[in-house]
Amino acid sequence: MTACLRRTRTLLALTFALAGAWAAAAAAAPLSLRDDSGQTLTLAAPVQRVVSLAPHLAELVFAAGAGDRLVGVMRYSDHPPEALLLPLVGDAFAINLEVVATLKPELLLVWRSGINPRQQQRLATLGLPIYANEISSVDGIADTLRRFGRLFGTEAVADAAALRTELRWRELRARYGRRSPVRVFYQLWHEPLMTANRSHLIHQAIIACGGINVFGGQPGLTPTVSWEAAVAADPQLVVTSGSDNEPARLEAWQRFSQVSAVAAGHLVALPGHRLARMSPAFVDGALALCEAIDRSRH
């Protein structure tokens, strides 16, 4: 064996040894990640047991390839169907801390806007790490997926889901965004009448579809508006969503035949609540909205 060949083999062996050492060190190193509240979370290893305290967070965990790590969810965590089989730990009004504790989670996922200070204080008494999430755009959905991939050690699945979400959103905007504008009223609730302003993800979907959110300029994320104001805005399309548990309620609009949407029969109930969920399913909901807006153009 020549000296040159021996040196080459020695270098290769050293390279592989160093690569293995680096990989082992990376696996053993603590995981440090900043959440959407600005707090840095440090964990010894990828999370194996997690409780989600918002339905969209459960969806994101599944989409990131870590559905098997979920040990507890909130009421209305219904997508994917496997989420319905998990223990319930509460709803939007109350969290059962005793149930949470018995599930022995390593991490709690909370929706920053969906939890009040009193609930935060009570959760802190459990002494568990808390990851606070806040999403205000489709980019935020993709970013959360990637961060969840790091939290759970499922980067390959999570990164692919994030990229797929970004590409689908880009394609939707390119396809529908430049079509003739349609005035849209999105009804979040019927009594009192509630809608979404420009800070809401639903507004972003309306704009991406080539629509105009007639109350986009209102203060508050989900402003309450009067029927007089809604009629005066004269939307060309009225949209809401519904499910078996919460049927769509659009019948009150029939009183106002002078509204363009009513006169044309453009009152649409989208199935499910995909547009209200800050998860990859939001893009599915946005596509259904775009199709409804497109039909109202004819």
Residue spans for each PLM region:
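Proline-aspartate-enriched helix->loop->beta-strand connector
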Residues: 94-113, 128, 226-243
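N-terminal secretory signal peptides that target proteins for export/translocation
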Residues: 1-6
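Boundary at the C-terminal end of the N-terminal hydrophobic targeting segment
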Residues: 23-30
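Bacterial N-terminal signal peptides
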Residues: 11-23
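A short, structured surface patch at a secondary-structure boundary
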Residues: 48-103, 107-113, 214
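Short helix-initiation/N-cap motifs at beta->coil->alpha
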Residues: 34-38, 89-98, 114, 218-227
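His/Asp/Glu-enriched short active-site or ligand-binding loop at hydrolase and phosphoryl-transfer sites
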Residues: 199-222, 268-269
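Extracytoplasmic substrate-binding proteins
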Residues: 31-33, 39-40, 106-107, 111, ...
